[in-house]
């Protein structure tokens, strides 16, 4: 039997209300170590709100969010990041005028800030870490490329790399393959499978073929509640899921 202490992420009784409307309603969600959990559901189901609650952008009305048994609900966003939770939003937030190498360097936790770059002393350790991450995100041959010149898919990978260099134990991604080519989607799937060997990944996604290729478990949200949870096959064949989501 798995206890709460064994989960990387343990959410219990989570509720958030906006002007009386419950965007998330008494949610219970448990994510294992090294798991890729995909959250799906119709627009307005509460998917992005759940990520906002986990990373501290939105505060819960009720309930508990525990990461490695650490309560997050009263922590600030930067404290949650430092604890080991990384969050990628739908649109890439990279420094378009910096090179790929510089984007990763700026993100290095003991590296430099954009304003403090004049005082930063680049070490061999930093350079080695950057090259390792670049290899993981398929950008080894683009380290000197200005980020604004990358393809849409490469920009998404770069932002994932900017999170990975901070070594989070939980990585949350909001629609990571939106706008990508078929080949980029396939490469992104392989990337996520690689990185979950050392961390847990929570993904919001609408592309069902992509979900099928990466998900260990799928959680279906509807009106702020869990409608169904299980393998992709279980979810796909559930009449209620077909009615509210997959049938549309």
Say what each PLM segment does.
Residues 171-175:
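Catalytic Walker B motif of ABC-type/P-loop ATPase nucleotide-binding domains
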Residues 211-213:
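A short, surface-exposed alpha-helical micro-motif characterized by mixed small hydrophobic
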